[in-house]
């Protein structure tokens, strides 16, 4: 099998190079540190340690689509490359709606790119076969992970790539929420979720924590007014066709395991290569489909 991507395995050299606080450790101490702490922390272990290094894998590709772009397109640097690739952007909303939303939530309306595909209208409309699709912090918002991967495969050339980043659940407001399991993914698939489940909306609205490093666990709360928050989350779920919420909570290891299982079960498009690169607060996933 051909290897398209750099290794995602633990490298002593890269671990030392990318973790400044560990540079004085011996090889033996580095290996022990990774085993005891670094793996759980999602520290950089390979030559792919930041978003730019990850996106550089796309150099030479000539047709690209970035989805879930909002006001932060990440492929503009490729437009200046000698290959002058075709670059399209897609989002659930159209450009005018994204500009309005950016103004409302304190984002940059001037950075919203031209939206070629409004994904609320489905992937069937897309009549371009791309070399690669890219997304950042988009996958965790997909109600049905299996269906999402089939959608992506449907707009790729044979052997096309899907490159994406996902927040590490232990480094964001999802800290106290349990990791998603294969059963969660299978439930969403067999029930054909088209929007986040009430469980996901409730977790996202009530049980996330932006002060998780202080150990304030919302799951331990006995505050009476929490009942009002539960009702608000339920009303939002019932009154809207779609709610923007995290449907999944992953670590690099848990995500890799679930994708490997789905591939073995033949529930997702056949994968030629899968690499997962930890990078601290997020991790990067490179998939080459058959």
Language-model segment annotations:
Residues 47-61:
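Class I SAM-dependent methyltransferase Rossmann-like catalytic core
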Residues 106-123, 147-153, 161-289:
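S-adenosyl-L-methionine-dependent methyltransferase catalytic module, highlighting the catalytic core
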Residues 62-177, 285-290:
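Conserved SAM-binding loop
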Residues 1-50:
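Charge-rich, low-complexity intrinsically disordered regions
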Residues 4, 137, 244:
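Generic anion/oxyanion-binding catalytic loop in active/binding sites
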Residues 48, 67-70, 267-270:
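Eukaryotic beta-rich interaction modules
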Residues 54-58, 77-81, 157, 275-278:
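A general structural signal for short secondary-structure junctions and capping/turn motifs
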């Amino acid at each position: 099998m051909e290897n398209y991507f750099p290794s995602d395995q633990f490298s002593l050299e890269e671990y030392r190079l990318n973790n400044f606080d560990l540079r004085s450790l011996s090889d033996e101490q580095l290996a022990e540190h990774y085993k005891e702490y670094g793996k759980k922390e999602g520290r950089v272990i390979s030559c792919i340690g930041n978003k730019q290094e990850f996106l550089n894998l796309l150099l030479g590709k000539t047709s690209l689509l970035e989805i879930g772009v909002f006001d932060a397109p990440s492929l503009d640097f490729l437009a200046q490359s000698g290959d002058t690739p075709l670059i399209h952007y897609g989002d659930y909303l159209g450009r005018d709606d994204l500009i309005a939303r950016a103004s409302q939530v304190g984002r940059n309306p001037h950075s919203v790119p031209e939206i070629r595909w409004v994904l609320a209208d489905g992937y069937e409309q897309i009549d371009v076969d791309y070399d690669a699709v890219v997304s950042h912090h988009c996958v965790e918002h997909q109600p049905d992970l299996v269906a999402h991967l089939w959608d992506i495969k449907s707009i790729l050339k044979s052997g096309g790539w899907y490159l994406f980043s996902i927040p590490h659940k232990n480094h964001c407001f999802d800290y106290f929420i349990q990791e998603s399991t294969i059963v969660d993914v299978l439930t969403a698939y067999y029930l054909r979720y088209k929007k986040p489940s009430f469980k996901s909306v409730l977790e996202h609205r009530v049980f996330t924590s932006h002060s998780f490093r202080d150990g304030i666990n919302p799951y331990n709360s006995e505050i009476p007014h929490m009942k009002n928050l539960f009702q608000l989350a339920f009303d939002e779920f019932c009154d809207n066709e779609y709610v923007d919420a995290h449907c999944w909570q992953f670590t690099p290891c848990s995500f890799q395991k679930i994708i490997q299982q789905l591939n073995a079960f033949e529930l997702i498009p056949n994968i030629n290569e899968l690499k997962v690169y930890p990078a601290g607060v997020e991790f990067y996933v490179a998939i080459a489909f058959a």
